[in-house]
Regions:
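Extended amphipathic alpha-helical interaction segments
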Residues: 126-189
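Boundary at the C-terminal end of the N-terminal hydrophobic targeting segment
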Residues: 14-20
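Flexible helix-coil transition and linker loops at the boundaries of alpha-helical arrays
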Residues: 51-65, 96-110, 141-150, 183-196
Length: 224
C-alpha cells in the first residue's frame, strides 16, 4: 500500500485507449497502471497520451481525465515539496478547468477542481492561506451545491475538512465521514469504472487519516 503515492495536500493503465476506459467510461488505463505500480514516468506518459487524444478529439471525457491526471501529478509534486515543478503544472491545470467549465455535464467536477486549485495555490505559497482560505471555503459551498452526488466533490470536502483549522470547521471526524461518502458514491450503481485511480486513492486517504486518528482497526479496514 505504501507504493500508492498520491495522498493530496488538501487534500484514471495497459488497455487499448489512453483516455477511455475499456468499457467506454472516463479513465486512463495508463494512469491507473502508473498509480498501482508507483511508476511516475508512466504517469507522465499517460498525461501525454491524454493530451494527444484531446488534441485529436476535443472530447469532454478525455479533457476531464487529463485534468484529473494532472490533479494527481500536482499533488504528488507538492507532497515531495517540488514546487518549481508543480508551479507550471498548476497553471496548466487552471486552464484545463476553464475548458472543462464549458461542458455542463462536468459542472460538479469543475467546481471540485476549483476547490483543489485553491489548495494547490496555498501549497505553493502558504503565506496566501489567509486570503485564499476563505475563498476556498466559499468555492467548496459552490461545489457541494453543484454536485452532492459526485464523489469527487466529497473528496475535496474531506480534504478541506482534514486540513483546515477547527475554528474554520476543520475536523478529522468530518473528513473521515466525507471520504466514506465519496467511496459510497463511487460504489453506487454499477460500481467504480475500470481504470479509476481516484477510487483507490480515496481508500488510501481515508486509511491515512484514520491512522493519524489512532484508529488502526478502521485504517486496516479502509486499506482492505
Amino acid at each position: 500500500m505504501r507504493r500508492i503515492l498520491f495522498a493530496l495536500l488538501l487534500s484514471s493503465q495497459a488497455f487499448a485507449f489512453a483516455g477511455v476506459s475499456p468499457e467506454g467510461g472516463c479513465g486512463s488505463c495508463t494512469i491507473y497502471r502508473s498509480y498501482i505500480s508507483g511508476n511516475m514516468e508512466l504517469w507522465k506518459k499517460g498525461m501525454q497520451e491524454l493530451q494527444a487524444e484531446f488534441s485529436r478529439t476535443s472530447g469532454p471525457c478525455t479533457l476531464y481525465t487529463l485534468a484529473e491526471a494532472r490533479y494527481g501529478y500536482i499533488g504528488y509534486l507538492l507532497g515531495r515539496d517540488e514546487k518549481d515543478l508543480a508551479r507550471p503544472e498548476v497553471e496548466i491545470f487552471a486552464g484545463e478547468i476553464e475548458k472543462l467549465a464549458s461542458f455542463p455535464e462536468y459542472r460538479a467536477e469543475t467546481e471540485a477542481f476549483r476547490v483543489a486549485l485553491f489548495g494547490f495555490r496555498m501549497g505553493l505559497s502558504p503565506a496566501r492561506a489567509m486570503t485564499l482560505g476563505p475563498k476556498a471555503l466559499k468555492q467548496l459551498e459552490v461545489a457541494v451545491a453543484a454536485g452532492k452526488d459526485s464523489p469527487v466533490v466529497w473528496i475535496e470536502k474531506a480534504n478541506s475538512e482534514a486540513h483546515m483549522p477547527a475554528f474554520a470547521g476543520g475536523s478529522k471526524e468530518k473528513a473521515a465521514a466525507s471520504f466514506r461518502e465519496a467511496l459510497k458514491l463511487f460504489e453506487a450503481g454499477a460500481g467504480p469504472e475500470k481504470c479509476t485511480w481516484r477510487y483507490l486513492n480515496t481508500m488510501v486517504l481515508l486509511g491515512q487519516l484514520l491512522e493519524r486518528m489512532d484508529d488502526y482497526r478502521g485504517a486496516r479496514e479502509a486499506y482492505l
